[in-house]
Swiss-Prot record:
GO biological process: L-histidine biosynthetic process
Alphabetized PROSITE patterns for the sequence: ATP_P_PHORIBOSYLTR (PS01316)
Protein's organism: Bacillus subtilis (strain 168)
Organismal lineage: Bacteria, Bacillati, Bacillota, Bacilli, Bacillales
Primary location class: cytoplasm
Name of the protein: ATP phosphoribosyltransferase
Name of the encoding gene: hisG
Domain-level remarks: Lacks the C-terminal regulatory region which is replaced by HisZ.
Protein family membership: Belongs to the ATP phosphoribosyltransferase family. Short subfamily.
Localisation: Cytoplasm
Documented EC number(s): 2.4.2.17
Length: 213
């Protein structure tokens, strides 16, 4: 019996892309894997256990060791700054963090208000720009904030830009590109380095193959 590897996976769009990547890497996941409503899924034939978590919680699970490895967006890693190893850029779930707001708006006022799910990232970015701002943390529907006068600008994830467009907002600043990463708990890596290295290697081959296309 090999070592059981527990992997934290984000629910939603990243989960489906990550599951596809694991299958390409040769891991035999059950057909109903993506459709399961379970939060813990065991795949005994691969010595794998999956914990399905909210995207913002994956790094927490890995840092605390309840998951040995995980797949997390770079946005979450920048925001949470957890003590985990970032082993591999999986090059999936591509998007970027951006500043956006209503067009033709004067933003020269004192301490503009910024609404975001990423208060740490936003604070750091505007500090680097030498701009003093007031951060308002929201948990969803960030695009609503400028429309109702809650904030002057927003910092949020942009994929296609369609959501911004539909709400009459325009992107004004590109903060950084985002992809999903394969992350590892430092203690788990010492105890299970063989199986973790194997998974990283198999995933890396798939990523390199996709990038070369």
């Amino acid at each position: 019996m090999g070592k059981l590897l527990t992997m934290a996976m984000p629910k939603g769009r990243i989960f489906e892309e990550a599951a596809g990547l694991l299958r390409q890497a040769g891991y035999r996941l059950p057909e109903e894997f993506e459709d399961s409503r379970k939060l813990i899924i065991d795949v005994p034939e691969e010595n794998l256990r999956f914990i399905l978590a909210k995207p913002m919680d994956v790094t927490t699970y890995v840092e605390h060791g309840v998951a040995d490895v995980g797949i997390a967006g770079k946005d979450v890693m920048l925001e949470e700054e957890r003590d985990v190893y970032e082993v591999l850029d999986l090059n999936i779930s591509k998007c970027h963090l951006a500043v956006a707001g209503l067009p033709n708006t004067d933003w020269s006022g004192v301490a503009p208000r910024i609404a975001t799910k990423y208060p740490n990232v936003a604070s750091s970015y505007f500090r680097e720009q030498g701009e003093q701002v007031e951060i308002i943390k929201l948990n969803g529907s960030i695009e609503l904030a400028p429309l109702i006068g809650l904030a002057d600008r927003i910092v949020d994830i942009v994929s296609t830009g369609q959501t911004l467009k539909e709400n009459g907002l325009v992107e004004t600043e590109h903060i950084c590109d985002i992809t999903s990463r394969f992350i590892v708990n430092p203690v788990s890596y010492r105890m299970k380095d063989d199986v973790i290295d194997e998974m990283a290697s198999r995933l890396s081959l798939v990523v390199e193959g996709e990038t070369a296309k």
